[in-house]
Amino acid sequence: MPNTAFPLVSVVTLTWNTTEVTCDFLRSINEHCQYPNLEIIVVDNGSAVDPTAVFKEIRSDVQVLLNGINLGFTGGNNVGIKAAKGRYLFIVNNDTEFTPGLLEGLVEVFEQHPDAGMVSPKFHYYFHKGTIEYAGYHPVNPFTGRNSMVGCKEKDSGQYETLSTTHYAHGGGMMVPRKVIDEVGALPEEFFIYYEELDWSEQIKRKGYRIYYQPKSLIYHKESMTTGKESPFKAFYHTRNRILFMKRNMSSLQKAIFFTYFTLFTIPKNTLKFIIKKQFLHLKSFWKGILWHFNREIKFNT
């Protein structure tokens, strides 16, 4: 890519009481990123201690925005999105590490494919290098309201090396043009956390854009290969947002399928599971996630 073809990229990441993780993230940019036209925005989501000075010791040009309170993944990142000046915004988790050519490969997709509305790189597990986490997303199952990542936990033997469209971007690293954000809107704050990237992808596709997976760009993610630890917090937001996503994005037939399955299978199964495990706070949060939808006016994506 010639030097004149390096449009400004805004890297936006979120931190909340994870100063050292974010420091490692910034160090990885210093070590591996050669992209010459870059701004870095770290949004602090109400950490107990202001991390600004620590971050600036590592990267003097970093912009640190202090929210004061935890606005969630969506609200926090939207603060950074609003402040960003780049033609392209790379919204990325702070528990990731860059590799050489990451940004160049993502920008290339937009420069060569005018229909691109969002693109994610290939994800490898940081603690299991050579093992794929993400090489695209499968569609959401209309019965369960869940989906899975293409290639997840497979050894990377070059089987996903073709640039391709995919159903959804990876919320841990997604590049979006400013013009698309201006047209579609920022991250949907109704979700707070979980399912937000799926909903945003649906909004972008409805405007006629496509979601791309770029295998030339690789990022390492400090995500466990095993299922994440359950918590009442996750039980609430996963339940609430799964229902919210299906309400906002699925056809009448798909919603009928989902709610029939959810009522007859998901509710009894999860209720019994939490009772057997004596996870009564999880059980309460699961039901709170369901009951949240009663007497709520849902904004549908059109």
Show where each model-derived region lies:
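Short beta-strand/loop segment that forms part of the nucleotide-sugar
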Residues: 37-46, 63-67
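Short aromatic/hydrophobic "clamp" motif used to bind/position activated sugar donors
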Residues: 89
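Conserved donor NDP-sugar-binding/catalytic core segment of glycosyltransferases
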Residues: 97-134, 140-142
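N-proximal low-complexity "stem/linker" segments adjacent to membrane-targeting elements
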Residues: 1-31
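A short, conserved alpha-helix in the catalytic core of glycosyltransferases
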Residues: 167-186, 190-218
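Glycine-rich, basic loop-to-helix element that forms the pyrophosphate-binding segment
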Residues: 66-84, 94-96
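Non-catalytic, C-terminal membrane-associated alpha-helical segments of glycosyltransferases
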Residues: 233-241, 251-302
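A conserved acidic beta->alpha catalytic loop
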Residues: 28, 44-53, 69
